[in-house]
Amino acid sequence: MSLAPWDIAICMHDIEFFTWRRTMLSRFQEMASAEDVFQELQFQTQKLEFDYYSLCVRHPVPFTRPKVAYYSTYPEAWVSYYQQHNFLAIDPVLKPENFSQGHLLWDDALFSEAQPLWDAARAHGLRRGVTQYLMLSNRALGFLSLSRMSAREGPIAHDELELKLQLLVRESLNVLARLQHEMVMTPAMRFSKRETEILRWTAEGKTSAEIAMILSISENTVNFHQKNMQKKFNAPQ
């Protein structure tokens, strides 16, 4: 039984994808520097017919102002404008509630509560975009965002684009983790021996008075160390 033309096209498309996948996995395994990762991402961004990309990691600490690290090929004018207007605070792409979707297309609905950001992005030539999310082993959130200056739909189907972005963000961050790049490493939080003891008993649900009795210190000393730890966590006091 012969295959119909469209069946042949589907088979060829699948073969091309898995060939690309094998090539990419091999390439990422051979990377020896962060620059290798960043250059490959730009190359793949253009192959997918986008213009710019941003690789971002949002760490879970400090709790009230989580550390955000990124590498971007966006125009410097846009990066400066974004920072000057503190768009980080309203960017829906970075909101944890959107992370569960995994694959996020940029559209009017997504930016409905961040209209100034959406208007400014388009004014700077960023008219279409997509973001792929990934949870890292240290509970940090990884984001790979691609954008283009053209408002037209890209030639690549959304399901294929999603599969490729899943691989790109996963392998990129895996390489950076292997290299122990600062972008993916959890911010260091150093505690004294006494602070560690108090933190452990606090996690057990003990009150300041109970911890004071257990450690044979005053309750004021316990409260003093707890306030110091709150500052390190950047948590509200």
Task: Label the predicted regions.
Residues 2-26, 34, 148-192:
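Juxtadomain coupling helices with adjacent low-complexity linkers
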Residues 22-26, 34-46, 118:
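Short amphipathic alpha-helical segments
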Residues 117-139:
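Helix-to-coil/beta transition segments that act as allosteric "coupling" elements at the rims
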Residues 207-237:
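Recognition helix of helix-turn-helix DNA-binding domains
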